[in-house]
């Protein structure tokens, strides 16, 4: 009975380690001393969309792309992208530490953007936040959002290398 339980536990540990190793192998990783820096979604020649360091996930600024000319729709689409990035990094909005929001027209769009934000944010784990008006990279963009979050746990703690 104990051998079976131990074998099953060992098998699960090996499967988890293999999965993590496969994920880690496809990430661009650099090491400085004992501090690992993991970069995900590095296809863009200018930036990574996700950087993980010391248990903190940094996302690049996200925009809605072609979500129309309504700030609510753009905010919803942008936050969906943020959710996807956080999930890929191994965390979620409930671990968000800070958010920066840029609006093309803060006087016109602040209230509507906040309605969507309030529906999205975890009410028990609200991050610090700043919202400012900014010239956007493309005329169609009304909102851009960048989120920094804590990891659920250290992704390297179970790996032996």
Predicted regions and their residues:
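N-terminal presequence-like segments and the immediate start of the first folded domain
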Residues: 4-6, 10-97, 103-161
